[in-house]
Each structure stands twice: as C-alpha cells, then as structure tokens.
Amino acid sequence: MSTATNPLDLDVCAREPIHIPGLIQPYGVLLVIDPADGRIVQASTTAADLLGVPMAALLGMPYTQVLTLPEAQPFAVDDQPQHLMHAEVRFPQRATPPASAWVAAWHLYPQQWLVEMEPRDARLLDVTLREAMPLLRSVERDPGIAEAAVRVAKGLRSLIGFDRVMIYRFDEEWNGDIIAEARKPELEAYLGLHYPASDIPAQARALYLRNRVRQIADVGYQPSPIQPTVHPQLGTPVDLSDVSLRSVSPVHLEYLANMGVTATLVASIVVNDALWGLISCHHYSPHFTNHAMRDVTDAVARTLAGRIGALQAVARARLESVLLTVREKLITDFNDAEHMTVELLDDMAPDLMDVVDADGVAIFHGNDISRHGTTPDVAALRRIRDHIESEHHEALREDAVGALHVDAIGEVFPELADLAPLAAGFIFVPLMPQSRSALLWTRREQIQQIKWAGNPQLAKLEDIPNSRLSPRKSFDLWQQTVRGRARRWSPLHLESARSLRVLIELMERKRFQQDFTLLEASLSRLRDGVAIIERGTANAAHRLLFVNTAFADVCGSDVAELIGRELQTLYASDAPRANVELLQDALRNGRAAYVTLPLQVSDGAPVYRQFHLEPLPSPSGVTAHWLLQLRDPE
C-alpha cells in the first residue's frame, strides 16, 4: 500500500476483490460443502453456535448430520449453477432449538455447494408478495418512468418500513442521480442529487447485476470469518458473488457511516440485461430485512424494470416510425433525381436535419460547403473536417457504414473547444471519400446545472498514511455548471445517420453503374486501347476499373488479369521518377496528364508508351475516374 497522501486512481477501488472477502455478515451462517461426498469443508465462525457443534468437529462432517431439511436433499442436475430458494431448516445437534426459526438458501456449483442460513424473524412475515400486488399492478399501468419511479419509492417504503427509499438511475458514464424519493419528513431531501461513478465502482455494479438484492443490517457489524480461508481442494477463497450474507467492503461501510446511514437494502433495476439503476433503501438505526421482505423488494424492482423497458420500447418504436417516414421521403427524392448533387442535398436539408434531430447540417462537396440550420461558419466547419480527416479517417474508412460522432467536441478535439456553442455535438458521415463529400450534423451546447452530493472531483479514495483506503466524507451540496456538451446522440439517431449514408452510396453506385455500363459498351468497340482508372483512397491505390481488348493486347495480358490491378503495376519500377511524379500529381488533383513511361509488358522487356490520362466528368465536380490511353511516343 502506498503511503502517499494524493488521491488515488479510481482503479485502486475497482481492483478490490469484493466477491472473495472471506467474511460474511454475522446475522447468518455459511457452510461450504463438497458435492462429491456431502461433507462440510468450510464454515463461518457463526456456524458452531447455531449448529451446536464445535468448529473443529464441524469441518469434515456430512451436512446431513447437522441440518434437517423438510424437502428432498439438493442435488446438481448438470454443470450449470443452481440457486434454491430459502426453505426452513432444523439443527438436530442442538440441545435446544434456536429462539427463531431459520431458513437456508442453496447455491449449487459443480465443485462446491454453498448454504447460507439466516433467521426467519416471524415479526416481519406480515409483509408478503400478496400485500405488494396492488403496487405491482399500478406500476404496470404508469404512463411514464418518472411516475412509476415515484410510485415505487412511496409504495415500497410503506411496505418495508425504511426511513428513506430512493430510485437511483445510472447515466452513460455510470454517474447516478436520484429521480424519485420517499422519506421521513424530518430527513434531508436527496431528490435530484447526483453521485459520481466512483461511488459505485465497476466490480460492485457487476455484483449488482448478478445478485439482485443485498442488505446490510447494521454497518457497524463485526464480520464472521470463513474457516479455513482457502478451500481445501480448490485452493482458492470461496466466491461469494451469489451469497446474500457476503460481507461488504470496509470502504463501503465507512462511506455509509459518513452519510449517517446504519442499514441499507438495495435492489437492482435491470432493463434488457443491463443495470439501469437501483432501488436504494436507507435506515438510520439497525434494520434486518428477512428473505420474504427481500423477495417483495425484488419483485417490485423487477416490475419497475419491466415497466421501464416497456416504456423505452414504446418511445423507441415511435421515434423509429418518425425517422422511417423521413427516410422514406428522402428515398423518394433520391429516386426522382438523376444524380446526387449539392443542389439536391440542399433542397433536402430540413429532412436531413430531422433524420437525426440535429440543430444544423453542413454539406461538403470538395472545397464547397453549404450550411443549413444552426451551424458554425464555413471556416469553423473546415476546421472540423480537417481534424476528422487527419485524426480519424482510418477508423471511418474501415467501418463501411460508420458515422463518427461526439457529444462534447472539446473532449475529443481540444483544439476545437471554442466551437462548442454551436457544435458541441456532431455526426460526421463521409459519402464519397474520393470527392471529399460528407454530411456533418451539429447540435448546440446545452449548459447544465448539476447538483452533486459532494464535490465529484474530491470523490476519489484517499490513501491515508499507515492506514487503509478511505472514502470521501463530504456529501454537502455542490453545484456544477457543465458546459461544452450537447444533447447525446441516441443509438436510433446514429443508426439513422448510418442508414442514410448507405442509402446515398447505394443510389450513387446505382447511377454510376448505369452510366458505366453504357460507357463500357461504347469503349469495348473501339479499336484503340483504352482503360478507366478509379481514384484511390488513403488505404487503396488507383486501380484499373475497365480495360478493352485492344488495351489488354498492348499490355500482353488478358482483360480479366488487368481489371482490378493497381495503375502503378503497368509501368516498370525503374521508370523516370520525374515522370511518375507528374502522373501521380495529376491523379491527386484530378487533372489530365500526358507522360511517357516504360510499359511493363508481361511477355517481354518494357516498351515506352505515352500515358494519356483524361479526367471523366463527375456530377460532384470532383474527379473520381480517368480515361487512360496508351500511345506511341511522339
């Protein structure tokens, strides 16, 4: 452990192995059983008192000697883990039964069985799933996520009696905010507060996704160690990921104590297999929640998650319908046009903005730029394109249907941070790289006022000299003004932009193929040798797109062998450098060239020919193809 006093990197907390603490909470008992012979190989120190057997004698005993189950013994059907719900259990070795009935839950794995036991606590059994049914039915009818969240917070608090119940929602960066709250009137309100991602690190979120309901009955508990600390056969600490009794990280316990919280109950809100948020319940005195009440909480969380998923699906379907209508209109306009031109895209500008819900759109054709809606000026737009092409062009070209997007321009391109007021967010879609045609959608900056529960910049764990990791202690309201960010582009809007790119490219290819077929038919009948050269890209050289028979004869090759070959393979490698550079310069700048080079004939020594290169007309005004003729030198 470092003794520096500087804030640690958050990875320090994220690396804490919270799934193998070697400890459980002391209100219960854990046994680890070898499925091969049913013998107990590990146990928590609380087991001896409950089972009436000293620890030394307990280890190695068949579990059937210390547990009496009302149902058939558990068994593993296959290699997949099984989790058996709580059922009453008795202890035949005890001289007198415990004061309260106990229940056991089984976690069956191929190499070990885990049995966790806890008191039933009959005083709490008046809260069952039956009492929760009116709440569940109402949540299923709520018209929005906000309404459902408020209903759950109020309804669950009335059912399980916690001092405070909150609905906690994660954002894309795993920061959280309280969107609904029910609390005792004398408690400070947390509604609307935000919490940094470091408060719930990645490995904790992974456990929330796996183990849906967790409680801490008293943050001041003294944990019960598991003995021995390492499994005798497996040689590893026991994995408690699925165990409700798992002891909590000391860092988290101190975090709760710093908030003044004594007991918690947390249920995961999982939507489409992703952790959407949490139902977080706080109590300010010790508070044990038995398995029946936890089952009620789990049912409420799952119902809320189902409603959130359904409402999100409806919203997505509505948005998809709107975007589909816009795309269909664009398809009709494309089909009615002879070619994809700047004027055509300019006429479509309102629909182009609607298709991704943008504030503005810029249309690039070579060095020409047209603007619509709210965008930066032309000079600023050129700066954006130049940065994209210089830093991200490789990724864009590798993704055939890619769309580069940002929500905070200054975070990706610090040199462009000054453009945030009008272009904090953008989507860049290249259409025809060889002609530098592209669409750039923009969104304006949205200034946000965020209320944090404590300064998020001070939320990192601190390494205390000669001590241990310590969480933050301040949760005082801290307001932050967030600038430089736009509304986030939703997956649907990004998908819509990609679909539009594919549509435009397909339309252009269709038009080109029609024109090329006519040109090919005409060129094939010529007696002179001619070829069509296609402009290359940063990742591909200029290539032969078409050759007629006469051209192939001059090269001493077949037509099929020549099509697709790189232009540079036509002339010898020792060709005069100055002439090669003249040819390449013409190709780069879309100009004509007349250069004498040694033609590499397949069946003999190079023969000097004059390469006549003429650019073919292009609707975009940027040369993408050339007509090549090979002539005798003058």
Swiss-Prot record:
GO terms for molecular function: photoreceptor activity. GO terms for biological process: detection of visible light; regulation of DNA-templated transcription. SUPFAM superfamilies: GAF domain-like, PYP-like sensor domain (PAS domain). InterPro entries: Bacterial_phytochrome-like, GAF, GAF-like_dom_sf, PAS, PAS-like_dom_sf, PAS_2, Phyto_chromo_attachment, Phytochrome. Residues 452-480 are annotated as: Tongue domain. Residues 13-118, 515-590 form the PAS domain. Biliverdin IXalpha binds at residue 13. Residues 151-305 form the GAF domain. Keywords: Chromophore, Photoreceptor protein, Receptor, Sensory transduction, Virulence. Residues 13-514 are annotated as: Photosensory core domain. Residues 325-508 are annotated as: Phytochrome-specific (PHY). Induction: Expressed in dark and light (at protein level). Part of the bphO-bphP operon. Residues 515-634 are annotated as: PAS9, output module, not required to bind biliverdin IX-alpha, required for dimerization. SMART domains: GAF (SM00065), PAS (SM00091). Disruption phenotype: No growth phenotype in liquid culture, slightly better growth on plates, strain loses slight sensitivity to white light. In planta is more virulent, with increased growth in host (A.thaliana) leaves, mutant opens leaf stomata better than wild-type, has decreased leaf callose deposits, produces more xanthan than wild-type and is insensitive to white light, has considerably increased sliding and slightly increased swimming mobility, generates mature biofilm in the light and dark. The keyword Phosphoprotein does not apply. Contains one covalently linked biliverdin IX-alpha chromophore; present in the crystal structure as a mixture of Pr and Meta-R configurations. In the N-terminal section; belongs to the phytochrome family. X.campestris pv. campestris colonizes plant leaves and is responsible for black rot in cruciferous plants (Brassicaceae). In the cruciferous model host organism A.thaliana, morning and midday infections result in more hypersensitive responses than evening or night infections, suggesting light plays a role in virulence. Forms head-to-head homodimers. Photoreceptor which exists in two forms that are reversibly interconvertible by light: far-red light (733 nm) converts protein to the red-absorbing (Pr) form, while red light (630 nm) partly converts the protein to the far-red-absorbing (Pfr) form. Regulates virulence of X.campestris pv. campestris on its host plants, perhaps by fine-tuning expression to ambient light levels and/or spatial cues. The Pr form may sense light and partially inhibit virulence; in the dark (Pfr form) biofilm and xanathan production rise and bacteria are more virulent. Composed of 4 domains; in the N-terminus the PAS2-GAF-PHY domains form the photosensor while the C-terminal PAS9 domain is the output module. Long linker helices serve as connectors within the GAF-PHY and PHY-PAS9 domain pairs, forming a helical spine where the dimer interface is assembled. Thus both the photosensor and PAS9 domains are required for dimerization. This is Bacteriophytochrome. It comes from Xanthomonas campestris pv. campestris (strain 8004). The lineage of its organism: Bacteria, Pseudomonadati, Pseudomonadota, Gammaproteobacteria, Lysobacterales.
